């Protein structure tokens, strides 16, 4: 039997087979209202039974950036070439794992996922080998939500995580743009 992150994370989190698939994305209306109506309507295509995406990305100009909303994450860069100094890189720690937990994307397996995340936080600076292994498991779960061969397959949960992450990062950028220049956006 071959083992990879798909089988390891799936087997670790589930004991009773596949998780339940969602029939629609699970994002509160109030969160969807934080983006432009055109972006919101693009994302709501995910609730159509045929699940055929007519629009794949929408680009908006805001705070000096071309910001691309889509189904693979939020991406943004300055609209024109710029020269900058004193650059700071900010990273949202365990963003997708925390969204997976918040949305309960794994159903009953979410509690095991929480245990893995808590264990990783506990040993992050004490045991690099175990910490990196747990990080690999945590991060592979998001991809497995959209992997048809995984017991974790739940495409609308994957898209819910992705959309939620885009809204959260977009909101963070809007708030930061009052006090700094945004030069790169990437979920």
Where are these regions (language model features)?
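Conserved "right-hand" nucleotidyltransferase catalytic core of DNA-directed polymerases
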Residues: 1-87, 92-98, 175-187
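Conserved catalytic core of nucleic-acid polymerases
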Residues: 82-187
């Amino acid at each position: 039997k071959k083992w990879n992150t798909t089988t390891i994370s799936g087997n670790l989190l589930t004991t009773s087979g596949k998780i339940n698939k969602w029939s629609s994305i699970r994002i509160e209306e109030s969160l969807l209202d934080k983006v432009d109506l055109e972006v919101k309507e693009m994302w709501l295509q995910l609730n159509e039974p045929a699940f055929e995406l007519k629009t794949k990305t929408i680009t908006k100009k805001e705070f000096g950036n071309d910001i691309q909303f889509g189904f693979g994450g939020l991406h943004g860069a300055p609209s024109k070439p710029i020269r900058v100094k004193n650059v700071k890189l900010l990273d949202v720690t365990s963003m997708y794992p925390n969204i997976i937990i918040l949305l309960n994307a794994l159903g009953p397996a979410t509690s095991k996922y929480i245990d893995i995340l808590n264990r990783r936080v506990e040993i992050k600076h004490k045991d690099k080998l175990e910490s990196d292994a747990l990080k690999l498991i945590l991060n592979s779960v998001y991809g497995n939500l959209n992997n048809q061969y995984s017991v974790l397959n739940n495409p609308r949960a994957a898209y819910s995580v992705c959309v939620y992450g885009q809204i959260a990062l977009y909101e963070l950028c809007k708030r930061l743009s009052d006090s700094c220049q945004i030069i790169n956006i990437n979920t």
